[in-house]
Structures are given as C-alpha cells and as structure tokens.
Design a protein with these regions (language model features):
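Short linear elements at protein peripheries
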Residues: 47-98, 109, 437
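Short acidic, glycine/serine/threonine-rich loops at helix termini
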Residues: 122-124, 130, 151, 157-159, ...
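Short hydrophobic core segments
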Residues: 140-150, 238
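Helical element adjacent to the flavin cofactor pocket in flavoenzyme catalytic cores
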Residues: 83-144, 303-304
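Dinucleotide-binding Rossmann-like beta1-alpha1 core, especially the glycine-rich loop
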Residues: 1-70
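Short coil/turn segments at secondary-structure boundaries
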Residues: 6-7, 21-30, 60-64, 99, ...
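C-terminal catalytic lobe of FAD-dependent flavoproteins
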Residues: 79, 86, 92-94, 102, ...
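Flavin (primarily FAD) binding-site architecture
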Residues: 147-162, 307
Length: 438
C-alpha cells in the first residue's frame, strides 16, 4: 500500500494545520533486542518512511539507548535500544462531529438517528426514503447518491440493482483502556511473534490505550464487543514486553470498532493484515442515475477521500467550486499547533476558576470555540450545575444545541470521553437533568 502510505504521510501536516485542537504530534517508540536481523529491516523501513514523508514539521526517526533511558523503567531487560519515529494522534469522535458542524454551517442538512430504508428512481432523480428513531418517514430527491455507510456499505447496495463485484471484509478491532502505565507521553509500537503490531498510546491524560486486534466480523447485526479471547491476547502481548503483569482486573474499559476493508470478488484472506487499507471509489449508473460507493478507507486520509469523491461527481454538478478543504480549518481549529499552550493560558487567564485539567480538555475538544461556549460566563456560578469531572451545564447546553447530542452516551462517549471517569451516580444525575432539558 505504498500509495496509501505516501498519501497518509503527506496528509499529516495538513491535518495538524486545519484541526490542531484535535490532532497533535506523537512520538512512537519501537523497542529492539540486540543482534536481531529484524532491527535492520525496521530501520530501513523507517528511513523510507521519513523519505516518503518529505519535508514535515514532525521530527525524523532517531535511535535511543534504552539502558540509560527513563523508557527502560518497565521494559524487560532484553530490550537494549529503540527507534523513535513520529506520527499524529486524532480524536476520532471529535473529528466526526466537527465535520458535521462544518457541513451544517455550509448548508448541509444533518439528520442524526436517521437511517436509509430504501431508494428508488423518481423521474430523473433519486428518491431516498429515510426513517428516524421516532418512526417518522421522510423522502428526499437528489441527483446522485454517495454510499459512504462504512461497514453498512453492502447493506445499502442491496437496495440497488448494482452489478459490481466489490464488497467489504468486516474486521473488528478491539482496544483496552487501563490506568496510565508510564509517566511520559510517548507511545509504544510493539511487534509480536505472530507478525501483528500492537500500540500502547497515552490516552485522555490519565490512561493508556492498548490495541488493536484484528478479528473477522460476520455482519453488522452483531454488535462488536471485545471478547475475553481478545482481552487475553492484548494483555499477554503487553506482558511479554514489560515487567508489570497486567490482568483483566486492570481493564477500566474496552471497546471495539469495525473496519470495512475493500474486497474484490469477495476474496477471502485469512490474514487480515494482508488486505489493503486503501479506498476504492466505484461510480456506476443504476437506471441511468449516478450511484457512487466508497469501499475501505482510513481516518488519516478522510479529507483526500472526500475531495476525490466530489471530483468524481463534478460532471453532475457543473457549478461545483474548486478544492478548498486544505486551507480551511475545522470549527475551533483557527490557530497554529505551536500556539496551543498559549491558548490554554489565555483561557485560564480569562476564566481563572477553570482548573488546569478542564482548560486543557476544552482546548483539546473545542479549540477557539471554547471562548464562544464560555462567552457569557463571568464567574464559576455561571457554569451552572456540575455533573462531575468539570462537565457543567454550560458545556452540556452547547453539546445539545450545537453538536447534535441527545443522550448521556452522546455526551460522555461520542462528544467527550468523560464516560471513563463518570460513576453511576454521576451518570444518573446527568440523565435526570437531560429528561427535563430535551
């Protein structure tokens, strides 16, 4: 996937520029054993990695001696040195909602809790039929349909008479969240005897994120969940590298996602890692109407993928403008990455009753929109009810009015990650308040 890697590496600097509040640099450490032939190939790979990336604000790969390093505090003694390379972290749930907010601001109609149940030809247009969580049926006319349903892409295609031979392989990836394992902000890139790679990543300041597995997921009717086997696999993987002995009791939370990998002619590969992570855009005409399906794709290249989709559809929208997303920040991202600490200090100076953790969280979630959220706040009392862990009425109101939030899970997991900290009593307090608010 040389093309995909090149595109993703070039894209990192763009993402750091247009969304510096939810995307930031991260250094990854690869522990190595002495005199292993794999060390040479890993170093060659990293040299190519840096070369493909070209000029970047991210630092290049370096080598460190672990025996005289603080990194060696928990690593087993057999690991004597390490390579350290650069990549980026993206707050994925914030990325999704900020794109939706931006689209709405530019004229899009965002329908949450609404699913497509059918579509049909109506004259020279598509008629898309939807059903929301209240059972209401709505119909929409459009020139073309873009099937960007991710793991549900094949389900949507079943509504058509499509003759394409493309499909998706559903691969479940599970993650574990444990209390912070290290007192630094480096991530670990770990390789196993089975050829798989596991990451240990600093997560939400107080935790470490461990993942991910790769397991075939049969269909989306089955809710993806981290199995006991996956938990054992990840814990054993980590324990082979570090002196501590993580057990299931150390797991604070676990979650699973499903990746829809592109598959041609329903190819079945037992090795999930061998299936491409690249995306394929398939434009076809069904009853003489354009229908474009997106297969596969990665989070890193979401912007390029979206621009390529519109480029393919330009003939149907002759008034479409030129590409613009590279130069336009997502909501709250109108500052430079090196200005982030200064922005936190500015927030604290204007609102001295916000503690350090809350100020950091606001800038990491909302960027410059933090000042819009708090514009009418003059004192701590103006924040309203405190539901716990610095989540107050003023923030929840913003999420309800501006970020399409409707439920406790929306607020604690899909807009923030405060669900990691909230206990049952705090959740109930928030839920009871929402009953009177919505």
């Amino acid at each position: 996937d040389f093309k995909l890697v090149k595109e993703a590496l070039k894209e990192r600097d763009v993402l750091l520029k247009i969304m510096p509040h939810i995307c930031w640099p991260m250094r990854f450490l690869i522990p190595l054993q002495s005199f292993k032939i794999n060390n040479f190939f890993i170093r060659c790979g990293l040299l190519i990695y840096d070369y493909i990336a070209g000029y970047s604000i991210l630092p290049k790969t370096e080598t460190t001696n672990l025996q005289n390093s603080s990194f060696n505090a928990f690593l087993k003694s057999k690991f004597t040195k390490a390579y350290i390379y650069s990549d980026c972290w993206v707050e994925d749930s914030r990325l999704v909602v900020l794109n939706a907010i931006d689209a709405k601001k530019r004229g899009a109609n965002i329908l949450t809790r609404t699913r497509v149940i059918n579509f049909e030809k109506k004259g020279k247009l598509w008629n898309v039929i939807t059903k929301n969580n209240k059972g209401e049926i709505h119909e929409f006319l459009c020139k073309c349909i873009v099937n960007a349903a991710g793991p549900w892409v094949d389900n949507i295609n079943n509504y058509t008479r499509s003759k394409n031979t493309f499909s998706t392989r559903l691969v479940k990836g599970s993650h574990l969240v444990v209390n912070k394992l290290f007192d630094h902000n480096y991530a670990f890139f770990l390789t196993g005897n089975d050829g798989r790679i596991i990451f240990v990543i600093p997560f939400q300041d107080e935790y470490s994120l461990i993942g991910t597995t790769e397991v075939v997921h049969q269909n989306m009717d089955q809710k993806p969940m981290c199995s006991d086997e996956e938990k054992d696999y990840l814990l054993n993987f980590i324990n082979n590298y570090f002196d501590f002995n993580l057990k299931t009791d150390n797991i604070i939370s676990s979650f699973s996602g499903v990746r829809p990998l592109y598959s041609k002619n329903n190819q079945k590969s037992k090795n999930m890692s061998s299936i491409t992570r690249d995306y394929v855009l398939n434009l076809e005409f069904i009853e003489n109407l354009p229908f474009l399906t997106i297969y596969g794709g990665k989070l890193t290249t979401f912007r390029k993928l979206s621009e390529n989709v519109l480029s393919r559809l330009k003939d149907f929208f002759p008034e479409m403008g030129s590409e613009w997303t590279m130069k336009n920040s997502l909501p709250g991202g109108d500052f430079l990455i090196h200005e982030k600490k200064e922005l936190v200090l500015k927030l604290q100076k204007k609102y001295p009753f916000l503690d350090q953790i809350c100020s950091n969280r606001f800038i990491n979630y909302y960027g410059t929109l933090s000042f819009e959220i708090l514009k009418n706040v003059k004192s701590k009392k103006d924040l309203g009810k405190n539901f716990g862990h610095s989540l107050t009425e003023i923030e929840v109101d913003w999420l309800l009015k501006n970020e399409f939030a409707k439920s406790v899970d929306d607020i604690l997991w899909r807009r923030t990650k405060l669900g990691l900290k909230f206990n049952d009593s705090e959740k109930n307090k928030l839920e009871n308040w929402l009953k009177y608010k919505i």
